[in-house]
């Protein structure tokens, strides 16, 4: 039977590995390297991504190819997602899905988000750099021109954010009418 893209003990073709494939089980029959239509015997896609470094990924033997090599959102400091999402099984769509990574596509469109994926929407006012982006994609966030670090941006920006003179500390005041 096919090895169903097992990450250990398989050759490049992964065909006819038998017991050397280790852990695929009969539920994976005939999947091939694409891992489409795998059964639960393939090991699933748990959130065991190990460390939370830049190369922290969900397991290779993912039965959903779209989730196989995107950053593992289960680690808060992993990749660009920054959420607390589960493994590949709960991923929907590309880059972890819109719902749990910061707003829906509709919400992004209403505040001028130009990114195709809503995993990390960017809703800056004109003139604001990438560090002035708001994660929740509700309203634009604007820092003073003297702001040079992301900590000078306000996370819940209903009005433009005014940083104090010392922009190296996360102290902001919100301008209210």
UniProtKB/Swiss-Prot annotation:
Q: Where is this region: 6 X 4 AA repeats of C-C-X-P?
A: 62-170
GO CC terms of this entry: cytosol; intermediate filament
Decide whether keyword Repeat is in the record.
Answer: yes
Keywords, alphabetical: Keratin, Repeat
Expression sites by tissue: Restricted to hair root, not detected in any other tissues.
Tagged with keyword Glycosyltransferase: no
Q: Which residues form a coiled coil?
A: none
The segments carrying the sequence repeats are 62-65, 118-121, 137-140, 147-150, 157-160, 167-170
Taxonomically, the superkingdom here is: Eukaryota
Q: Which family does it belong to?
A: Belongs to the KRTAP type 5 family.
Oligomeric form and interacting partners: Interacts with hair keratins.
Task of the protein? In the hair cortex, hair keratin intermediate filaments are embedded in an interfilamentous matrix, consisting of hair keratin-associated protein (KRTAP), which are essential for the formation of a rigid and resistant hair shaft through their extensive disulfide bond cross-linking with abundant cysteine residues of hair keratins. The matrix proteins include the high-sulfur and high-glycine-tyrosine keratins.
Q: What is this protein called?
A: Keratin-associated protein 5-2
